[in-house]
């Protein structure tokens, strides 16, 4: 699907290969598909999809020790982020003004938590749309209705389903999809990808 050799960073090359191997393993585990049973192609906006007796979209993300995959019969985006200290200089440069204000009202662990919730939701949305970082992160606002995130563009609510994925307390992971679809989410620890299927 990707030209893995094009990545200069050996770690990125390795993780990309592991991620694509994970997709093939899941296609077999979930639907019994062997590699000759399907074609992986790049759709509009550079988003990968599987064409077989059915069509399924998928998306990958990796951070720290985890690679996560989301599958859906409609377009989908997923992002995982290992929590660290909030980078307020990044927020001030890239986030929506309302998000920056919310972050500035917090400190310590609460600020760190919200920063990575924002970041993961935003990344999952950009991966859902396929626009990547060509669309500015400040061009839309994330608001949390309780723990459920919503996305507003020019004060208009986007009709999407955005859900938190409970992967690990040290990570934030969100998936973004059409409201009619509940994606399948599959997290893997990187070392586990070297284990054979049971």
Regions found by a protein language model. Name each.
Residues 1-198:
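Core catalytic alpha/beta fold that binds nucleotide/phospho-ligands
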């Amino acid at each position: 699907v990707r030209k893995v050799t094009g990545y200069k960073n050996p770690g990125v090359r390795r993780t990309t290969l592991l991620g694509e191997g994970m997709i093939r393993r899941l296609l077999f585990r979930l639907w019994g598909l062997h590699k000759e049973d399907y074609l992986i192609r790049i759709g509009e906006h550079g988003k990968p999809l599987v064409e077989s007796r059915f069509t399924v979209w998928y998306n990958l993300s990796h951070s720290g020790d985890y690679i996560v995959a989301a599958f859906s019969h409609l377009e989908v985006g997923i992002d995982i982020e290992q929590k660290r200290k909030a980078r307020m200089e990044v927020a001030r440069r890239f986030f929506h003004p309302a998000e920056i204000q919310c972050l500035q009202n917090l400190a310590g662990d609460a600020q760190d938590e919200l920063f990575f919730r924002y970041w993961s939701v935003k990344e999952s949305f950009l991966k859902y749309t396929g626009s990547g970082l060509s669309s500015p992160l400040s061009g839309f606002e994330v608001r949390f209705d309780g723990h459920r995130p919503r996305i507003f563009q020019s004060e208009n609510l986007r009709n999407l389903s955005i859900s938190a994925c409970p992967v690990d307390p040290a990570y934030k992971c969100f998936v973004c999809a059409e409201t009619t679809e509940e994606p399948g989410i599959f997290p893997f620890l990187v070392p586990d990808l070297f284990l054979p299927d049971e």
